[in-house]
Each structure stands twice: as structure tokens, then as C-alpha cells.
Curated annotation (Swiss-Prot):
2-oxoglutarate binds at R171. This is PKHD-type hydroxylase Nham_3637. GO terms for molecular function: 2-oxoglutarate-dependent dioxygenase activity; iron ion binding; L-ascorbic acid binding. NCBIfam families: PRK05467.1-2 (NF003973), PRK05467.1-3 (NF003974), PRK05467.1-4 (NF003975). It comes from Nitrobacter hamburgensis (strain DSM 10229 / NCIMB 13809 / X14). Binds 1 Fe(2+) ion per subunit. SUPFAM superfamilies: Clavaminate synthase-like.
């Protein structure tokens, strides 16, 4: 299930991120890659744990917690602290086909996060760079994603995906993983579809008795399937 989440960050927040990044040193992105991913990863990354990375990560987390579409699509239990990467044309940067590690350990805590859902939050406008598409593969084929700054795509962590070579400009983004309360992707998609249907029904027929019964069904399913 791929879900586009628009306007996660405001233009002002995106601009603030870019200003902070402009005065921060970047490191080789392979520092956070697993063995398989490191062989195909060619990009730069903000160092984890720096004041700048923590400030921007906290901004993203606060925005996610205020976003009902993200909560509905992902049903977040634990969000890995957001990371930030950059792909430059002059370095012929790209990220070959790979699958994200199933488990990520939060640095300095020992906390392990199961990567049920992967997310990419775009911080560069499409007009700023050529190439750099995020290509996600599923049973229906390959989906190429290149969104406006401030918009985000979420997709199953089990997906094979890659980032094409940037041939002009720079592509800047935040990326992170979420452990969902519902680990099964099919059940999670069903819950999202049910929630969206309830919202549409309530908007069209707010007094319809099915709104209450379907809402009850949603929460009872969540009780059955959610992992504490």
C-alpha cells in the first residue's frame, strides 16, 4: 500500500530545514546502511545525533503526530528518529535496488524498531533536480515517486526500491521507518480503507446510523489486531 501524504511540512518549515542543512557538514550515507544496502548506496547524510539532526527530526516527528492521514495509514507504534539524506548530480549519486533492514536499533538507546512502514519526506522541489525518483516495486509493478517539497510517501518496508541517479541539482529528503501497531500489511491496508470509508460516509451522511456501527467495527478490529 503506497499512500501519498501532502503538506506534512509547511513551506516555511521546509525552508528552515534547508537553511539548517546548508550550514551542516554531511557524511557518507553508507554509515547507516546494512551490508547489502551499503554495496549500492551512494549519497550523503546528516550525521545522526548532532543538534541539527535532532532539531529537524523533532520537527518532522511533531508534524507526523499532527497528521491524521499518516496516523490512519500507518497506525504508528514507534517511529525511528528521522534521518536526512542528499543526492548530488556532481557525485553521480543514487541508491540501487535494496530492501530496508527488518530491524533498526535507535542509536544510544538499545531500542529496536521493526520497520513495517518506510517513509520518504521530500525537501527539494521537483524543479530543483533531474533524476532522483524513488522507484518502489510491488506486485503491480514499479511506481516512480517524485513529490513536491513537504509531501511524503509511505510504503511497506518489505518493498524492493531504489533511487535513480541525480543528473542535475540536489535531491534532499528525510527518511525513516515506523513500527506499526498492526504489522500485517494486508490488515493494515484494510483498516486504512475502512477508516477512509467511514470519513467519507460521515461527510456525506453525518446522521447515518452506519457511521456509528462502522466506527465500532473499526475500533474492535483494532483491539483484535493491534500489538501492544
Amino acid at each position: 500500500m503506497l499512500v501519498r501524504i501532502p503538506n506534512v511540512l509547511t513551506p516555511e518549515q521546509v525552508q528552515h530545514c534547508r537553511e539548517v542543512m546548508a550550514r551542516t557538514a554531511w557524511v557518507d550515507g553508507r554509515v547507516t546502511a546494512g551490508h547489502q544496502s551499503a554495496q549500492v548506496k551512494r549519497n550523503l547524510q546528516l550525521p545522526e545525533g548532532t543538534p541539527e539532526a535532532r532539531e529537524l527530526g523533532d520537527m518532522v516527528l511533531a508534524a507526523l503526530n499532527r497528521n491524521p492521514l499518516f496516523v490512519s495509514a500507518v497506525l504508528p507504534k514507534t517511529i525511528f528518529p528521522p534521518l536526512f539524506n542528499r543526492y548530488d548530480a556532481d557525485g553521480e549519486m543514487n541508491f540501487g535496488s535494496h530492501v530496508d533492514n527488518a530491524i533498526r536499533t535507535v542509536p544510544g538507546t538499545g531500542m529496536r524498531v521493526r520497520t513495517d512502514v518506510s517513509s520518504t519526506l521530500f525537501l527539494s522541489s521537483p524543479e530543483e533536480y533531474d533524476g532522483g525518483e524513488l522507484v518502489i516495486e510491488d506486485t503491480y509493478g514499479a511506481h516512480s515517486v517524485k513529490l513536491p517539497a513537504g509531501d511524503m510517501i509511505v510504503y511497506p518496508g518489505t518493498s524492493v526500491h531504489h533511487v535513480t541517479k541525480v543528473t542535475r541539482g540536489s535531491r534532499i529528503a528525510s527518511f525513516f521507518w515506523t513500527e506499526s501497531m498492526i504489522s500485517d500489511v494486508i490488515r493494515r491496508a484494510m483498516m486504512f480503507d475502512l477508516d477512509m470509508s467511514i470519513i467519507r460516509l460521515n461527510a456525506d451522511h453525518p446522521e447515518h446510523p452506519s457511521v456509528v456501527s462502522l466506527t465500532s467495527l473499526y475500533h474492535n478490529l483494532l483491539r483484535q489486531w493491534a500489538q501492544s
